[in-house]
Amino acid sequence: MYQKISVLIIEDEKSICDFIGKTLDSHEYKVTVANNGKDGLALITSSLPDLVLLDLGLPDMDGMDIIRKTREWSSLPIIVISARTQEKEKVQALDAGADDYITKPFGTFELLARIRTAIRHNNK
């Protein structure tokens, strides 16, 4: 039996959550959403998703803290989705343990390709 790949979206902007959620749902991913960092961290530990899509600019905490805390115990793929476009910020996120970094705005095909790549690399 085929099991859907589970993706946790940690993003506070509803329109972006809806866009990503509908895109992933239509491509047979199981989607869970958290609108803040606290809920996101709780869902990472309780639901153990196959992949996390993470915004850095959350209302209650910086996404960098979520990366660091998750990396203390897990190697699950984390793809940052952020409006932060400075090279320094991208490098910091990748060095903290993010597997990839996509800047907003982004296209559907790029997002799906990066998810497939992260899952493929994690399964090796």
Q: Model features per residue range: what roles?
A:
Residues 1-123:
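N-terminal/domain-start alpha-helical segments
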